[in-house]
Design a protein with these regions (language model features):
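Positively charged, low-complexity/disordered segments
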Residues: 342-345
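Short, solvent-exposed loop/turn and secondary-structure capping segments
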Residues: 69, 150-153, 201-203
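Conserved Walker A/P-loop ATP-binding site and its immediately adjacent core
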Residues: 2-23, 27-29, 36, 62-65, ...
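Inter-lobe coupling linker of SF2 helicases/translocases
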Residues: 42-89, 94-96, 100-103, 107-138, ...
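Motif I (Walker A/P-loop) of helicase-class P-loop NTPases
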Residues: 1, 173, 205
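Structural signal for conserved beta-strand scaffold positions within catalytic alpha/beta enzyme cores
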Residues: 31-33, 291-292
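Glycine-rich, phosphate-binding/catalytic loops in enzymes
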Residues: 22-24, 73-77, 155-163, 206-210
Length: 345
């Protein structure tokens, strides 16, 4: 490696620098500050990365997003995404898929096309230093789960934990990972996280897209539905409703099969360490369950949460006034201290 770029949470850049120098006292480091990425200073700082001979450059997550890929590469990758979703739409129409799913995919395609049109119409400034010009040949990403909201196309509907929303920072990271794969033969990106899978098994698919896109292409598993049908299945179970009253049937993508094959593929890039293997110092704890009966006021408030949830599900309340996020938040507050309900805390 000639020049390594470490992308870490914003508040940890200095801590990373101190620990890096503790391990490698003679290393030549460049560490970004908040001022370095202000509009007036950003170009100068990127020029220092491009022209300097550094062992490592340490920047924050939000600063990383401000270093653009070249417009040509962005156009090419956006067009690839559009082609991919058009293929999925054509397949759905051939299989007589649900109109709702097709419409959702067409909406996503139009959104991508709008981004592409905006990119094509933008003024090309020759003085902008692009990510490719930095000379970076290794990309290390700490707390990589912060980039888990990557675009996802699927014909599945009403499956909990299957988010098709995307974050711009995740799309940006994905494009840069693809570039790093190109120049290093798929060996230029290293993710570090304690929670690669936290809420949904689809997060494993997302990690594999970041780190094993070439492998997924070879095995025809780049599309989520192909990956899901090969390695997992949806299961429906009865669970407590979030408002705390009653139960509901919920479908989740929560069961794997062909697990040995999946893990063998994932371990081509993953070095997994459990707390037992690392012998981490964890204090012993003694748990005691104390059951406390709810007060009348709490019972009334739980009933109110249920009424609010019913109104949200029926669509008779504006989301800006009330929504399930507010309701579950109030439920958590009520669980610990009823006086917190209705307060910002």
């Amino acid at each position: 490696s000639q020049k390594s770029l470490f992308v870490v949470p914003n508040h940890l850049t200095l801590q990373w620098a101190n620990e890096f120098l503790h391990l490698y006292p003679s290393a030549k480091l460049l560490v970004a500050t908040k001022k370095d990425f202000e509009t007036a200073n950003r170009k100068k700082f990127c020029a220092r990365i491009a022209t300097g001979d550094y062992d490592a450059v340490i920047i924050g997550h939000s600063q990383f997003e401000k270093i653009p890929l070249s417009a040509e590469r962005q156009e090419r990758q956006l067009q690839e995404q559009i082609d991919e979703i058009e293929g999925a739409i054509a397949e759905l129409k051939y299989q007589r898929g649900e109109n709702f799913t097709i419409k959702q995919m067409e909406k996503t395609r139009k959104s991508l096309e709008a981004r592409l049109d905006k990119l094509l119409a933008a003024d090309r400034k020759d003085d902008v230093i692009t990510f490719e010009q930095l000379g970076v040949d290794r990309l290390f990403v700490d707390e990589s789960h912060a980039f888990k909201n990557l675009f996802l196309y699927t014909k599945m509907r009403n499956v909990a934990g299957l988010s098709t929303s995307e974050a711009q920072k995740s799309s940006d990271m994905f494009m840069k990972c693809r570039y790093m794969d190109e120049i290093t033969g798929g060996r230029g990106v290293i993710f570090a996280t304690g929670t690669p899978v936290s809420n949904s098994m689809t997060e494993l698919y997302t990690v594999m897209r970041y780190l094993q896109y070439g492998t997924l292409q070879k095995k025809n598993l780049t599309h989520f539905d192909s990956w899901a049908s090969t390695f997992g299945e949806t299961t429906t179970a009865i669970e407590l409703a979030p408002e705390g009253t009653g139960y509901r049937a919920r479908t989740r993508f929560a069961k794997f099969f062909n697990l040995p094959e999946l893990m063998n593929m994932f371990k081509e890039v993953a070095d997994i360490k459990t707390s037992d293997q690392l012998n981490l110092p964890v204090p012993e704890a003694k748990f005691e369950t104390v059951v406390v009966q709810p007060s009348e006021h709490q019972q009334d408030m739980v009933a109110e949460l249920s009424e609010r949830a019913a109104a949200v599900h029926a669509g008779i309340v504006d989301p800006s006034e009330d929504n399930m996020l507010k309701i579950t938040s109030d439920g958590r507050k009520l669980r610990s201290e009823e006086r917190r309900v209705g307060k910002e805390c």
